[in-house]
Regions:
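Periplasmic c-type cytochrome electron-transfer domains
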Residues: 1-338
């Protein structure tokens, strides 16, 4: 860990494992995934099955990994509304902590505090599966660097480890040794992301959707998936003072051993995850041609994602397990309408 609580890069493979590479550079290797089916049963006697992922690295291009390397798989987060999330006042996020601190049911979220290179200080994290980036600018520049190896003013070093000499010798895209994406271009990308609209709700007057909304509140899902906020300051005038319904508290919660990755990140421990916004979740199959959810995509649909909840959310999960199928279907219809 560094001084900000960030895990240190693996010596040979860095912070992020990459299975592909440009011409003339060796790929880091391959990742093999297999799943174990975990059967379960609802109170009404109907059955379900969850899939537990197992990962194996093969064809390593730069030698074995260091023993004890912490690995945490990720799927890409959803993009709609990120500019609005960026504009939620920090005071509102901290208020969520205070409101939950007085609860007696074990739901006690906390913020992650991370170093924001754009602010030059530690601030409340709000993006990433463990709330490990602080702003949309931070998230964007970090993704350019970590996901596709593009340097910027705040992330100027090439993402090559000492063993990756072919990576270090590859051509650079920046002019005169400067960053590969300049500030003006990065700002345009940030503006594009910030103004991605949230899709309109569907079927909100449907009787099952409305009943599902009541069940959502009854199961205490809305404690962590806080429905609404009013946005505050933003570089983009159209995003200021907006009533929004992202359904998140942006806090870290212990989700139990079933979802644990064992990898700390800032103040987040190996069992804690940020509550993801739910808006647009029902359109993921239309946009991405799949319905994989949670940090590593193990859940194949909304109901499976709910059934993976543990830890602070286990009481909510138990309520869903007790629901008859008609109620479970209504709950899922509501979530997918957001």
């Amino acid at each position: 860990m560094d001084a900000h609580g960030t895990p240190q890069p693996e010596p040979s493979y860095g912070e992020q494992f990459t299975h592909s590479a440009i011409q003339g550079v060796r790929a880091e290797g391959k990742v093999r995934i297999r799943y174990t089916e975990l059967p379960g049963q609802f109170a009404d006697g109907s059955h379900y099955s969850l899939r537990q992922p197992h990962y194996r690295f093969t064809d390593l291009g730069y030698g074995p990994m260091q023993p004890g390397t912490l690995v945490s798989p990720r799927i890409a987060p959803q993009m709609p509304g990120v500019g609005l999330v960026d504009a939620i006042p920090e005071a509102d996020i901290l208020a969520n902590v205070q409101q939950q601190a007085s609860r007696s049911d074990g739901i006690h979220g906390m913020v992650n505090r991370v170093f924001d290179p754009f602010a030059g200080k530690d601030v409340v994290g709000r993006f990433g599966w463990k709330a490990n980036t602080a702003s949309l600018a931070h998230q964007s520049a970090a993704a350019f660097h970590g996901d596709i190896g593009i340097t910027s003013e705040k992330f100027p070093r090439e993402d090559c480890t000492p063993k990756q000499k072919d990576c270090a010798a590859a051509p650079r895209g920046g002019e005169k040794g400067g960053p590969e994406i300049d500030n003006a271009t990065l700002e345009k990308v940030i503006q594009y992301q910030a103004t991605l609209a949230v899709p309109a709700r569907r079927n909100y007057d449907n009787v099952d959707v409305r009943r599902g909304q009541a069940l959502f509140a009854q199961a205490q899902c809305a404690v962590c998936h806080r429905p609404s906020y009013t946005t505050g300051a933003s570089p983009f005038p159209s995003l200021r003072g907006q009533k929004i319904t992202p359904y998140t508290d942006l806090l870290l919660h212990d989700m139990g051993k079933g979802l644990a990755d064992g990898r700390p990140d800032g103040l987040a421990n190996g069992q804690q995850w940020r509550t993801p916004p739910l808006w647009g979740i029902g359109l993921i199959p239309d946009v991405n041609d799949h319905s994989f959810l949670l940090h590593d995509g193990r859940a194949r649909n909304t109901l499976e994602a709910i059934l993976w909840h543990g830890g602070e959310a286990d009481a909510a999960r138990q309520q869903v397990l007790k629901m008859p199928k008609t109620d479970r279907d209504a709950l899922v219809k509501f979530v997918n309408s957001l």
